[in-house]
Amino acid sequence: IGIGEFGEVCSGRLKMPGKREICVAIKTLKAGYTDKQRRDFLSEASIMGQFDHPNIIRLEGVVTKCKPVMIITEYMENGSLDAFLRKNDGRFTVIQLVGILRGIASGMKYLSDMSYVHRDLAARNILVNSNLVCKVSDFGMSRVLEEDPDAAYTTREITGTYQSQGGKIPIRWTAPEAITYRKFTSASDVWSYGIVMWEVMSYGERPYWDMSNQDVIKAIEEGYRLPPPMDCPVSLHQLMLDCWQKERAERPKFSQIVNMLDKLIRNPNSLKRTGGEIARPNTTLLEPSSPE
């Protein structure tokens, strides 16, 4: 069903003694791996195994006694959220889209309550099951908050990405302070969540379109922000802008985001008002917000 960082991902069936057979996803570690690769591969499972939440991908187990080494998780029929949205462009109601966003926010609230920072939150790292339930996955870059933020990082100024144990840091999803000072916190996850909101409401469009990473960094620094996707309710775009506050202390907490989305779901009329529809403005991004 896909290729992971360490090898292929297959679907299969798991039958544990005394339990019914279930569908699972099986990540394998390709042959010829180093000790460090094996540790990195299995560290994702040890992180996942600590979580128990309906919006976090569930670890079923690992196979380490024989080769290939495997990580077994629940199977998500609809695959990654970005591809799923592109395939179903325009097919969902606003309430369904907000329901998707609420699930993701709920999973992220749980992670932040557990003092976990994901660092790589993006629609491609969210999986969708047959009931449209979304679950946060891909814990290859997650860290416990207490960890020394400098440990795994070497700066790569030229490309505008950072090298980490989990690979390169995705500039267009990452908060400015995380790019510049490697300050990864739940508040930088909130910035990424705002980008995920934009991806969901635009049905999987690429954030900042064809701009280069350097141009994205510069634009954000100058105060530009992504415009509302077509037909996006004003209240949702405002929440995105809140997530993209330059000062991380001013961004909402995931608990507040969950509450706001619940409120919108309870009052569907609050989702009626959409802005003057700009699909893709010539300026590409919103004008910098003028200082009040």
Curated annotation (Swiss-Prot):
Documented EC number(s): 2.7.10.1
Annotated active site: D120
List of residues binding ATP: I1, G2, I3, G4, E5, F6, G7, E8, V9, K27
Entry membrane topology: Single-pass type I membrane protein
Enzyme class: transferase
Main location: membrane
Subcellular location: Cell membrane; Early endosome
GO biological process entries: anterior/posterior pattern specification; cell surface receptor protein tyrosine kinase signaling pathway; cell-cell recognition; forebrain development; negative regulation of axon extension; negative regulation of collateral sprouting of intact axon in response to injury; optic vesicle morphogenesis; regulation of myelination
SMART domains the UniProt entry points to: TyrKc
Family: Belongs to the protein kinase superfamily. Tyr protein kinase family. Ephrin receptor subfamily.
Protein name: Ephrin type-A receptor 4a
Taxonomic lineage: Eukaryota, Metazoa, Chordata, Craniata, Vertebrata
